[in-house]
Amino acid sequence: MDAFRLAPCGPLRGRLRVPGDKSVTHRGLMLLALAEGEGRLFYPLKAGDTLSTARVLQALGAEVREEGPHFLVRGRGLRFQEPEDVLDCGNAGTLMRLLLGLLAGQEGLFAVLTGDASLRRRPMGRVVAPLRAMGARVDGREEGERAPLAVRGAPLRGLRYTLPVPSAQVKSALLLAGLFAEGVTEVEEPTPTRDHTERLFRHFGLPLEVEGRKVRTWRTGPFPAKDLVVPGDFSSAAFFLVAALVTPGSEVVVEGVGLNPTRTGLLTVLKAMGADLEWQVLEGEAGEPVGWVRARHSLLKGVAVDPGLIPLMVDEVPVLAAAAAWAEGETYIPGLSELRVKESDRVRAIAENLRALGVEVEEGPDWLRIRGGGVRPGRVRPFHDHRIAMAFAVAGLPVGVEVEEPHWAEISYPGFFQDLLRLCAAS
C-alpha cells in the first residue's frame, strides 16, 4: 500500500492561495448548465468531485469546456437532454443529491445515477423522501435509500418542508426542484447551514425569499448565463491554518479565500482555544465574502464545542481534531451524527487515527472527547476520505507522519502535499 512520508516540519512560512471552493464550483456549474447562453466559471476547483459534475452535465447536453484554469459553460435553457448512459457521480455526494433535485422536474427525462463504492453506501433517502412528496419519481436500492438511483422527470408541486437535521445538500436539492414546481417551495432549517445556493440564486436572478430560517423559491422562466468568480475554499485553507497553529515558529497567510459566515465556524472554535488568528473580508463576488486569514503558532487549550457551530464547520471537524490533539487539556466535540455518513464514518476514522498517533480519545454515537498534549510519529489511514488524509497529515506534521493512500486528497485538493512541503521548505 503506497504511503507518503512527511518528515518533521520546522516552521511553516509563507502565503498561499488554495483551490476554488468545491461547494460553489458544483453549484455554479449546475446553474450555468441550466441557464441560456454562455458563461464562465473563473478559478473553479478542478478536482475529482467537480470534474465528475462537469462530465455529468456534459452527458445531459450542456457544453462544459476547460479554458486554462477556468470553465466555459453553454447552458441548456432549463431543459436537459436524456443521457444515453448511467450518470457516474464518482465520490461526490453533493453532486448526486443536488442532481436528484435538478432532474426531478425534467418531465419525461429518464436518468440513472450511480457512484463509487463509498457513495453507493451513503444515505439518499433524506433527499428522495421530500422530492417524492413534491411528486418526483425516484427509485433505487433499499427503496431509494442507496444508489444506484433511477429518476423519471415528472410534474412537481411546491412543498413546505422542515429539515429534520441541518443539511445544505437537502435544502439545495429542494430549492433546485422548486424551480420546476407549481407553487411555492419552502425549506425551513433547524439551524443555519451553508447558503451558497441562495447566494447563487440571487446572482443569477432566480426567485428567492429568505425569512429567518425559511427559504422559498418558485417556478422560474429562462434566465441568462452570468460569469462567476469562485473564491478559494475555506475547507482547504483550514488545513494550513491548523498546521501553522500547531507547528512552533509558524506564520501562514491564506489569500483570496471565501469567508462566508455559514462556513467559518472553525475560526470561532479555534479562537476560543487560544489561536492567534486574524482575518479580513476585502471583497465579495456573487455575494460571497472573500478575504485573507493569518495564523501563527499558538499554545492551544481544550474546549467544549458548541453543537450549534457544527453545521457551520461540518467539513472541518477532522482538522479541528488535529488541533485538539495538540491542545492542552480536553476537547469535547458533540453533534457529530452527520459525520457518520460522510465519505467515511469520520467519527470512527478520527478516533482510530488519533489513537495511531498516541492520542487518548473517547468515541460516542455522535461525539468525540480528545485529551490533547501532543502526538507521536505514526502511520495514518484516510479510509478513502480526502479530508481525513489531509487532516492527519497536519496532525502529525510537527513530529513526522506517514499517510497511507495519499491520492485521496486529490478529490478536493490535487496539490495539497506539494503546497504543504513548499511552506515547510520556506522556513
Curated annotation (Swiss-Prot):
Keywords: Amino-acid biosynthesis, Aromatic amino acid biosynthesis, Cytoplasm, Transferase
Quaternary structure, from the entry: Monomer.
Active-site residues, record numbering mapped to chain: D315
Family, per entry: Belongs to the EPSP synthase family.
Gene3D superfamilies linked to this entry: Enolpyruvate transferase domain
Gene of this entry: aroA
One Pfam family, short name: EPSP_synthase
Main location: cytoplasm
Pathway the protein acts in: Metabolic intermediate biosynthesis; chorismate biosynthesis; chorismate from D-erythrose 4-phosphate and phosphoenolpyruvate: step 6/7
Any Gene Ontology CC annotation: cytoplasm
Presence of the UniProt keyword Cytoplasm in the record: yes
Keyword ATP-binding applies: no
Protein's recorded name: 3-phosphoshikimate 1-carboxyvinyltransferase
EC numbers, comma separated: 2.5.1.19
Binding site for 3-phosphoshikimate: K22, S23, R27, S167, Q169, D315, K342
Source species: Thermus thermophilus (strain ATCC 27634 / DSM 579 / HB8)
